[in-house]
Amino acid sequence: MTLLTQSSTWQALSAHSKNVPHMRELFATDAARFNKMSLSACGLLLDYSKNRATAETLDLLFALASNSQLEAKIKAMFAGEIINTTEKRAVLHTALRSTAEQSIIAEGQDIVPEVQQTLNKMQGFVSSVTSGQWKGYTSKAITDIVSIGIGGSFLGPKIVSQALRPYWNPELKCHFVANVDGTSISEKLKLLDPETTLFIMSSKSFGTQETLTNTLTAREWFLAKGGLQSDVAKHFVAVTSNVAKATDFGIDADNIFPMWDWVGGRYSLWSAIGLPIALLIGMDNFRALLSGAHQMDEHFANAPLTENMPVIMGLLSLWYGNFFNAQSHVVLTYDHYLRGLPAYFQQLDMESNGKSVTLNGTDVDYSTGPVIWGGEGTNGQHAYHQLLHQGTALIPADFIMPLQSHNPIGEHHDQLASNCFGQTQALMQGRTFDEALAELANSALSATEKQLIAKHKVMPGNKPSNTLLMDKLTPSTLGALIALYEHRTFVQGAIWDINSFDQWGVELGKDLGNDVLARIGASQDCDALDASSNALINLYRQGKI
């Protein structure tokens, strides 16, 4: 057993998990439960009353956090200590949304001035493009942005841009390319005019396979459509640490934005990686996005554990994963603009906490990161919600909804909200056999049929959920929401004693992919790998089954 599972608090939680009353009973015996188990911070309200949790549960979870030195670990992250121990890096995405007055030290120097300098450079660039001052090679203004990246440099900008659609500059369109599948970029290029298109290449090394391949294809298309190599600088900019490679490609050094080792890809949308966002919504709104995240940073760093929104959400998720064998967690967004958030949180959580050894290399003997999945309401209610209500797996849920819509048409939002709240209620209370039977009392079914159908209509309830509300989806509330999930992820990793900031599984996939690519291009069939890989590679070389 690890020190974590040997601890008295862990053992107490294990014993306590077998004795928590049904949520129906918890609500029936405490009319003030919502008031006791909800809190507001940074423009968000969290209702966590619909959880399998009592005051004793929370006390034990907070004790587990304290015993795991969570507060010290939070301070270490914000202070720029080397908490990504396997890569010997600080973890300071929070510095990207700090105020200019702050001082944050990394590798012996204050990094805030460089962050502010980059924001100011972004401001100038955004102003140049959106004002029409930036011209393409035929002196036409830019109308289309193509953001080329992968992982965090793709998903963050795409999802945030999608979420903030009401704030877009109507004169600009943005297209996102990530997958190395040629179909992805080909379909985008069909829509574009090379004279008015600007490409943003985001890669720390300027050598990430997918990103470089797509960028080279974009340049080939640009040159084939009439542009010259000397025109590339008017249509390509980069976010990278490798200035030499970018300038060799044809990008002007003045149009290269920095990346830093202390920012992981999945936490990078707040940096110059967010340039597509800034172009679409303007720098004032981009700064509001940063401000909302900064407010959540301050809350996370300073609120006591018992009143700390990311801490509470992280602990409750851990509670179900480690003591109720919940192996997945569903995120349900009741706002069409937020439909991409489940995929973003999936990457954030699963890439961070999909680990199986502790910081000192000991194999864990407890579950770590769950599968994160989800979608938008009310679509999911006519699909996978069935499994949430009557399936055999326990799947905790997060419901996210703005109280006000950007598109208040008729009763649409009233119906959306009623479905959202109704789902949380149904998951919590379920339906007993007697209730199901009573509903069938006036039907034409026989007594035997009523008994049978009632059995099928029973729902156990006691299915946990959180509800997150905001007045309206704005850059600020979105920033706070994303930072909330970042810190929630940190909380779990800190208690599990794993490194939430490396991704060696991703690196292995890259290495083996490069090896296979070389074998595909070899002059002879492959026979050096396992039988399955050999066969698949050789079938691909033949081009037919």
From Swiss-Prot:
Keyword Heme belongs to the record: no
Transmembrane annotation, as ranges: none
GO cellular component: a single term: cytosol
Reaction(s) this enzyme catalyzes, per UniProt: alpha-D-glucose 6-phosphate = beta-D-fructose 6-phosphate
Pathway: Carbohydrate biosynthesis; gluconeogenesis; Carbohydrate degradation; glycolysis; D-glyceraldehyde 3-phosphate and glycerone phosphate from D-glucose: step 2/4
Protein EC: 5.3.1.9
Record-given protein name: Glucose-6-phosphate isomerase
Protein species of origin: Shewanella baltica (strain OS155 / ATCC BAA-1091)
Lineage: Bacteria, Pseudomonadati, Pseudomonadota, Gammaproteobacteria, Alteromonadales
Gene expressing this chain: pgi
